[in-house]
Design a protein with these regions (language model features):
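Amphipathic secondary-structure elements and adjacent low-complexity, charged linkers
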Residues: 1-7, 89, 97
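Single-pass alpha-helical membrane anchors
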Residues: 3-29
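Cell-wall polysaccharide-cleaving catalytic domain and substrate-binding groove, primarily
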Residues: 22-176
Length: 176
């Protein structure tokens, strides 16, 4: 086979591949609105808590009518914006402290995400959050002024990423 015919064959295969990919793409677009197709592409790989605007993965309960909550994805609450999901997290932390007398990072996270079959990583969670906060997990009471830093660390642990600016988190906490 000559170099010229090899190059021609290679170019032909590339063109066929491009045309096939274009036809598949056009077919998919014709079956779904462009917005849906874009959401699918954008949402690929996005952690559930970020997609749901529920960055601390608060479980859905019908009796909890959180401000900004739009429903559930089956297990977790869905909010209209991350600020409302963060607000709910701050309200829960405050409730745990005021009504149940929990104060340390260990106390709060043991209530938040109890150890068990669904959460074998509680000790890692506690260490991660305490380290990010710069405090010992059992020796310091968490102050409400520390909620933004604590919630940022919780978001990072829950989702593997913490995509929000600290002022967004602080605003969500201030809504509580």
């Amino acid at each position: 086979m000559s170099v010229k015919s090899f190059m021609w064959t290679r170019a032909s295969l590339l063109m066929v591949s491009v045309l096939t990919a274009w036809q598949v793409f056009r077919h998919r677009l014709s079956k779904a609105p462009i917005q849906t197709a874009l959401e699918e592409v954008i949402g690929m790989g996005t952690p559930r808590g970020i997609r749901n605007h529920n960055p601390t993965n608060i479980e859905y309960h019908a009796r909890n009518d959180w401000l900004g909550q739009t429903g559930s994805d089956g297990r977790f609450a869905v909010f209209t914006s991350p600020e409302y999901g963060i607000r709910a997290a701050a309200k829960l932390l405050r409730r745990y402290q005021q009504r149940e007398g929990l104060g340390t990072v260990r106390d709060l996270l043991s209530k938040w995400a109890p150890a068990g079959q669904d959460n074998p990583h509680l000790d890692n969670y506690i260490r991660h959050v305490a380290k990010r906060m710069g405090i010992h997990p059992t020796q310091h009471k968490v102050l409400s002024s520390q909620y933004p830093v604590m919630i940022a660390a919780m978001i990072e642990f829950e989702n593997g990423v913490q995509p929000y600016e600290m002022n967004t988190i602080a605003y969500g906490v201030s809504l509580a």
